[in-house]
Regions:
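Transmembrane-helix bundle segments that line or gate the permeation/cavity pathway
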Residues: 41-60, 129-238, 255
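Cytosolic juxtamembrane amphipathic/interface segments immediately preceding
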Residues: 7-19, 153-157, 238-245, 313-316
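Alpha-helical transmembrane segments and their immediate interhelical/interface regions
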Residues: 120-152, 284-306
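N-terminal signal-anchor module of multipass membrane proteins
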Residues: 2-51, 114-120
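Low-complexity, proline/glycine-enriched hydrophobic segments characteristic of transmembrane helices
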Residues: 42-120
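Membrane-interface segments at the starts/ends of alpha-helical transmembrane spans
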Residues: 14-19, 110-125, 198-210, 243, ...
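Hydrophobic alpha-helical membrane-insertion segments
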Residues: 30-37, 165-182, 329-338
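Long, contiguous internal "core" modules enriched in hydrophobic/ aromatic residues
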Residues: 25, 84-93, 98-107, 208-210, ...
Length: 341
């Protein structure tokens, strides 16, 4: 540790996007934007069709049950002079009309018609952001736990997971944007208090204020730790010595503990609470397993890609075997937790 891990040539190695790769990336982004627009258009068209069909169903129900309305009108006219009798008959007519209209199967009447096209688009953005957050957090945990374990083999590929968790600030911006449309996604916000006994028992935890505060704390600490580990890692390579290593060791040890708590609560807040009526005692571990499996797969793909482009020549077959072992292990662990779930 008295000297730098890499040669000066390796320290100055920088990945540069070729024009071909840049065009592919821009092309994929363009295709993604087009698909989003097409999906929004189709969802909007589907909503309009649903509204039309709902109106037709309502008309058909009235046409198929004219007796109900006739009886209601006759009873109302016959009992016009007797208030109590008219009210009773009118109540029976309303009850019969509700049964004919199918309130129970209609999702509670006219107040709820399912997700709109706007909700679908926002949910797609929300889930996409979640996907990349889990990969970035898997990479951050990978660096921290290997620093705590003083593992030397990952030094050769450390810059790749560091680049992966560099996405966290952008993910935080996406998370902040998600706060603006929480009422379009989370059922525990959509359903008013007092209408669902089970959700009411969870409102001490599941409430917008607590959700936002926890999210800000989690992302703030994660980004701070990521930036500190990245900076200390760079200094360690350029300056050598043990000072920066020991600092990163202490930070990593504390972060591993914080990660276990914060990431479990994050999984409950951002994923599990989408279905507030569902119970799980291992969902945090299940999410962690999937996050690590995805991060290891992404890390392996990126390292192999960089080697094919002529970078990271110091990465050998032993490193590749370690990647494969990690990916296999966490995939099995994820599958085991899925079966247990």
């Amino acid at each position: 540790m008295a000297s730098s891990h890499f040669t000066p040539e390796q320290l100055t190695e920088r990945f540069e996007l070729s024009s071909r790769i840049r065009n592919i990336v821009y092309g994929l982004v363009g295709v993604g934007v087009i698909l989003v627009l097409i999906g929004a258009f189709l969802a909007q068209s589907g909503d309009g069709h649903h509204d039309d069909s709902h109106g037709e169903e309502h008309a058909e129900l009235i046409t198929e049950n004219p007796t109900i309305h006739t009886v209601a009108n006759d009873q109302h006219e016959d009992g016009h002079g007797e208030d109590s009798h008219a009210d009773e008959d009118h109540g029976h007519a309303d009850s019969a009309h509700s049964e004919a209209h199918g309130d129970d199967g209609h999702g509670g009447g006219h107040g709820h018609h399912g997700p709109t096209w706007v909700t679908r688009v926002l949910t797609g953005f929300y889930m996409s952001n979640l996907y990349f957050i889990t990969i970035a957090m898997g990479a951050l945990f990978f660096i921290a736990v290997h620093r705590v374990g003083n593992a030397g083999w990952q030094t050769a590929i450390r810059r790749v997971p560091e680049a992966m968790f560099g996405w966290l600030p952008f993910a935080a911006v996406g998370a902040l944007a998600s706060f603006l449309f929480m009422d379009q996604i989370f059922e525990w916000i959509i359903i008013p208090e007092g209408q669902d006994a089970l959700i009411d028992t969870k409102r001490a935890y599941l409430n917008p204020t607590g959700f936002i505060i926890r999210s800000i704390i989690f992302f703030g600490v994660w980004i701070l730790v990521a930036r500190m580990l990245r900076r200390l890692s760079t200094r360690e390579d350029t300056l050598g010595g043990l000072q920066n290593f020991e600092k990163s060791l202490g930070i990593s040890a504390g972060f591993v503990v914080f990660f276990a708590i914060s990431y479990s609560l994050f999984a409950i807040d951002w994923i599990k609470s989408l279905e507030p009526h569902w119970f799980s005692t291992i969902f945090g571990v299940y999410t962690f397993a999937g996050s690590m499996a995805s991060a290891m797969a992404t890390l392996t793909i990126l390292v192999y890609f960089l080697r094919r482009q002529g970078y990271m020549k110091y990465v050998n077959d032993s490193h590749a075997q370690d990647f494969n072992t990690y990916m296999l292990g966490f995939s099995i662990f994820w599958a085991y937790m899925w079966v247990s779930q």
